[in-house]
Amino acid sequence: MSVIHTTEYGNGYSLDQLIGDSGDIYYRACKDSVCRYAEDHYIAMMYLEGMGWDPKQQDPQ
């Protein structure tokens, strides 16, 4: 798996877009070193919110 794009949201929150060896796209939502993987961007954003990220208070950097 390789990272295509990373978005840092501050306070340890980040979202990586990954591509697998077979060409499939995945997402990795992280808070510090705790990460969850998803095949869908919407689900990955829900994971970030579940980890405590508030999209109304933080802008991507």
Regions of interest found by a model, annotated:
Residues 1-28, 35, 60:
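Short N-terminal "domain-start" leader segments
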Residues 26-57:
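A short, charged, amphipathic alpha-helix used as a generic interaction element across diverse proteins
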